[in-house]
A protein has these predicted regions:
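Feature marking well-ordered beta-strand scaffolds used for ligand recognition
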Residues: 1-183
Length: 183
């Protein structure tokens, strides 16, 4: 559930109602008065929630998509990058890591602009360690560790006309906390 709270004398007091009841929250991103939440149950919506009045949060948009993003990152004006999993909704099997670019220019009408599935990649660190993702919208680059048949660090660019493009991949043999850096 999504519950809005307010800090009062060193503790949090619930001020808003429950949203997305019965759903597991996979990722969240707050951009001003709007919060974006991806939940997971059977169908995996991306909610946009108006949080300008903490005592009365309102779902203003909902995009139902297959799979889910367990990492969300703003990617330039009006765009939100999602990294997660592509899931076959009928048999509930994972098809690979899914990249999504969302158009959030109108929070009430969020659209998935483009997707790309890395079919031989089963997981990333993005869902549990936000520092594991390198993302620079100005340079149009983002990267992360990818785990599947091998362990690789992958980097991508995004173009509205052509979608996602892998621009770098390096096998990692001895790894710890590998992160990308642009110099």
């Amino acid at each position: 559930n999504i519950t809005v709270g307010e800090e009062v004398d060193y503790y949090t007091e619930v001020t808003g109602g429950d949203l997305a009841e019965g759903e597991d929250i996979r990722s969240a991103r707050f951009l001003g008065d709007i919060g974006y939440f991806v939940t997971f149950k059977q169908i995996d919506p991306l909610f946009s929630v108006d949080l300008s009045d903490p005592s009365n949060p309102k779902i203003i948009g909902e995009l139902k998509i297959p799979g889910f993003s367990d990492y969300l990152h703003p990617y330039g004006d009006g765009k939100l990058l999602g990294i997660g999993l592509s899931v076959d909704e009928e048999v509930m099997t994972t098809e690979g890591v899914k990249l999504s670019m969302f158009d959030i220019s109108d929070p009430a009408n969020v659209k998935e602009m483009s997707t790309y599935v890395l079919e031989n990649v089963l997981s990333t660190d993005a869902g549990y360690n936000y520092k594991a993702v390198f993302a620079d919208a100005e340079k149009n680059l983002f990267g992360f560790m990818a785990y599947g048949d091998s362990i690789e660090y992958k980097m991508f660019t995004y173009d509205e006309a052509e979608g996602f493009k892998e621009v770098f991949s390096k096998d990692i043999v001895n790894y710890g906390n590998v992160r990308g850096l642009y110099i």
